[in-house]
Amino acid sequence: MSVRVVVCGALGRMGRRIIELALQDKDVEVVGGVEHPDCVPSIDLGEALGKEELKGKPLTSRLEELLPYTDVVIEFSGNPTAAVGHAELTTLEKKAIVIGTTGFTKQEIEQIKEFSKNAPVLLSPNMSLGVNLLFKLAEIAAKVLKDKNFDAEIMEIHHRFKKDAPSGTAMKLAEILSETLEKKNLVFGRKGEAPRKEDEIGVMALRGGDVVGDHTVYFLGFGERIELTHRATSRDTFAKGAVEAAKWIKGKEPGFYTMFDVLGL
């Protein structure tokens, strides 16, 4: 039986790619899309996206209208406040949700975790296989290099239109390094005339052009350095991961999941 999905942020860059790949998957059915009220035209999802196979599928600003007909909500609205609201609505109806929106506060993440007591929730700042492998490799390297006099730094680059900085992926990397290295002092950008402190982890964000997403973790020692880099050249890597996550989470028990669970990492 196919997985019925609703995509929040259906007309955005990621939403469009998720829908495109979902249409190519025989195990997935797109039942509708959700957008901000200012972005919802008076036409259906098929007309909005130019997809004949989606003609008659609803496009609305009210997720609750579509929940009775869906198994999994894929949340890529790009708006953390809206995403929290969508997570609450979805889990109250005992439906699963996959969240790829980034930029959440710690309090918002705790809210989402609380919602997962009612229904399965998967939250990941990046759903590509490569980035999740980068998360794991960074953790392994940090464990080996801890107390070996190596400094850890993170740099990320994205297109000029990305709203949050640093990216959710960079912040996840920072979280992994901070916990593994037991260094809690995150420094966002550098300026001034002070030397680097031993307990720091630097996080740098660059914005420009059409860069889909580059992330590098640096382990900087004396006489050598290690660089772990992931470069995304297509949003399809993220979109494919979101579709696979939706297929995986259907029927799961209530709880809080990540892409590590999907990928078995």
UniProtKB/Swiss-Prot annotation:
It holds the Pfam family DapB_N. InterPro entries: DapB_C, DapB_N, DapB_N_CS, DHDPR_bac, NAD(P)-bd_dom_sf. The keyword rRNA processing does not apply. Pathway: Amino-acid biosynthesis; L-lysine biosynthesis via DAP pathway; (S)-tetrahydrodipicolinate from L-aspartate: step 4/4. One of its GO terms (cellular component) is cytosol. One of its GO terms (biological process) is lysine biosynthetic process via diaminopimelate. CDD domains: DHDPR_N. NAD(+) binds at residues 9-14, 100-102, 124-127. It is found in: Cytoplasm. One of its GO terms (molecular function) is NADP binding. Its main location: cytoplasm. Its EC number is 1.17.1.8. The active site is at residues 158, 162. (S)-2,3,4,5-tetrahydrodipicolinate binds at residues 159, 168-169. Keywords: Amino-acid biosynthesis, Cytoplasm, Diaminopimelate biosynthesis, Lysine biosynthesis, NAD, NADP, Oxidoreductase. PROSITE patterns: DAPB. It catalyses: (S)-2,3,4,5-tetrahydrodipicolinate + NAD(+) + H2O = (2S,4S)-4-hydroxy-2,3,4,5-tetrahydrodipicolinate + NADH + H(+); (S)-2,3,4,5-tetrahydrodipicolinate + NADP(+) + H2O = (2S,4S)-4-hydroxy-2,3,4,5-tetrahydrodipicolinate + NADPH + H(+). It comes from the Bacteria. It is an enzyme of class 1 (oxidoreductase). Catalyzes the conversion of 4-hydroxy-tetrahydrodipicolinate (HTPA) to tetrahydrodipicolinate. Belongs to the DapB family. This is 4-hydroxy-tetrahydrodipicolinate reductase.
